[in-house]
Amino acid sequence: MHPDVSADLSELDTTLRTVESVLDVEELRRRIDELEHQAADPELWNDQEHAQQVTSQLSHSQAELRRVEELRTRLDDMPVLYELAEDEGAEAIADADAERHSLREDIAAMEVKTMLSGEYDERDALVNIRSGAGGVDAADWAEMLMRMYIRWAEKHGYGVEVYDTSYAEEAGIKSATFAVKAPYSYGTLSVEMGTHRLVRISPFDNQGRRQTSFAEVEVLPVVETTDHIDVNENDVRVDVYRSSGPGGQSVNTTDSAVRLTHIPTGIVVTCQNEKSQLQNKVSAMRVLQAKLLEVKRKEERAEMDALKGDGGSSWGNQMRSYVLHPYQMVKDLRTEYEVNNPSSVLDGDIDGFLESGIRWRMRENQAS
């Protein structure tokens, strides 16, 4: 085996051992046994929300263990693969090199998962997208972003629940709120917070002029009972109205949509995607609790910044540029990570951006 290959495999082994240590593989196996025991309890589904949490955690833990075990097997097989390849010739060696490069990428992706250790990182994510400057193009852009994140979730087998979609008059959306239901989806998607900028030839401009549009992405952790975010009913004004679809058309004959206004903070939440008013109210309350938790977290961060004499982080402003004309490129303005295939990115292939963002955030946190 070539010395460079041997050194590379040794480096990969060191990285994978670190991943195995951080994940605590033996503890992960113990946790899976515990969750399997809970899942086998016939009374589990008496509480459907808890049952869904247990089955989701079990599925995620099993997948995580399977991934790290597969990586270990592939790495342990590499010396034998190269030994056989050297007997077979250049083409087999090229195949072995390709497997080694693929393995390096997969171990790096697994390593990123170990960087999600924040207080709320393992929670489900609540994503809110709002169109910004750019008129109808901005509304269309907001809908494109919504599709991008939902496609990303679907490709990973994650559940998505859309709580609210406020459609614009001509095309696109004014705003949308949806949950991505998978362990660590908040920690992963939270690096997407900020302003996303699109440059393209406007499909809505008869003269075919170039248009710059903006949309804002907000990502919050889904609130759990342990967060103690209690909402006084007297502080919330409840309004009901009929759900509307694209172009403002009514999609329901009853007043099933719900708008909650939290009077002390002025936070307004709407939900219209459920079939009943009660379901919409429950979903809207979840979103309101998540927003109130974020208010609490911002206050705590402001106190810490004041103690450190720090002006706070501004990374959540304009963070990524998507250029479709006059050239094709998507570039993260914080990490400098870029790709030249916007169509793939807009179809949900954003793992490279997520991984580079998580690594960037870790470096920023260490520096501060």
UniProtKB/Swiss-Prot annotation:
UniProt subcellular location: Cytoplasm
Modification after translation: Methylated by PrmC. Methylation increases the termination efficiency of RF2.
InterPro entries found in the cross-reference section: PCRF, Pep_chain_release_fac_I, Pep_chain_release_fac_I_sf, PrfB
A Pfam match: PCRF
PROSITE patterns in the record: RF_PROK_I (PS00745)
MF annotations from Gene Ontology: translation release factor activity, codon specific
Keyword annotations: Cytoplasm, Methylation, Protein biosynthesis
SUPFAM superfamilies: Release factor
A Gene Ontology cellular-component term: cytoplasm
Modification sites for N5-methylglutamine: 249
Protein family membership: Belongs to the prokaryotic/mitochondrial release factor family.
Function (record text): Peptide chain release factor 2 directs the termination of translation in response to the peptide chain termination codons UGA and UAA.
Protein name as annotated: Peptide chain release factor 2
Organism: Rhodococcus opacus (strain B4)
Lineage: Bacteria, Bacillati, Actinomycetota, Actinomycetes, Mycobacteriales
Name of the gene this protein is made from: prfB
